[in-house]
A protein has these predicted regions:
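GST-like fold's C-terminal all-alpha helical module
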Residues: 104, 108-220
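Long hydrophobic alpha-helical segments typical of transmembrane helices together
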Residues: 210-240
């Protein structure tokens, strides 16, 4: 049986949300776990930009943006009225893709992602946009600038965290605090979750003591979900 091919990288947040959508829609695919240092030739042929996820359908159609893959999954599930294996109703996911939800995901994928990258890798940035790793001999100054940079971008990232916390308080966009997936699961949850997970992992002690209790509970619920665990199994690296 021929299956769609998904080129993926286990720890990539974009690939995570694509895998979650595929699993939720009960769409079987052949997962090809790539090496970032030696990307498969076929993947580069069908998607020269060289980033994951890349979904190659049986008819040769290529979908190489994670949000587009999520939307395609929803269309497939709706057309065949798939019986879902995992928590939630796909109708709830589909119903909540309105303008506000899309705007929330857009902020995640632009401003928040930039702050996340700088927070995770402060050595690549400084207060003035200078790469810190160009000053390897200035150890004390390097450490000081690195910490200042990390705190700066964490603070900027917190603007989005605070907004999500407020949404969880008010149940806006079904980004709810009930954690009942049948009622609260939506497009934004899956699209945003992998990035909040990464932000929290930079300094888990700080996050666990931060002033975002609703967001923290929401994150823990997703991390512990059978859906997430099912897409985080380790696959051998594809060679080809």
């Amino acid at each position: 049986m021929n299956l769609p091919i998904l080129y993926s990288y286990r720890r990539c947040p974009y690939a995570m949300r694509a895998r979650m959508a595929l699993k939720l829609a009960d769409i079987a695919v052949e997962i090809r776990e790539i090496s970032l240092r030696e990307k498969p030739k076929h993947m580069l042929q069908v998607s020269p930009k060289g980033t994951v996820p890349v979904l190659v359908l049986v008819d040769g159609t290529v979908i190489d943006e994670s949000l587009a893959i999520m939307l395609w999954c929803m269309e497939q599930a709706a057309s065949k009225q798939t019986t879902l294996k995992y928590e939630g109703e796909y109708a709830a996911l589909q119903a909540n893709i309105h303008a506000g939800c899309r705007a929330l995901v857009l902020v995640n994928d632009t401003d928040f992602k930039k702050n996340l990258d700088a927070y995770k890798y402060p050595e690549r940035y400084s207060q003035h946009g200078i790469q810190l790793d160009l000053q390897p001999n200035l150890h004390l100054e390097h450490a000081k600038l690195k910490l200042q940079t990390q705190l700066k971008y964490r603070t900027q990232g917190e603007v989005f965290l605070a907004h999500l916390e407020s949404l969880l308080q008010t149940n806006t966009y079904s980004f709810a605090n009930t954690f009942n997936f049948a009622n609260s699961l939506n497009f934004a949850d899956i699209a945003i979750f992998p990035f909040i997970r990464q932000f929290a992992m930079v300094d888990s002690a700080w996050f666990e003591n931060s002033n975002y209790p609703k967001l923290r509970a929401w994150l823990h619920n997703w991390v512990d979900s059978s859906l997430f665990k099912s897409v985080m199994t380790k696959d051998p690296t594809f060679v080809g």
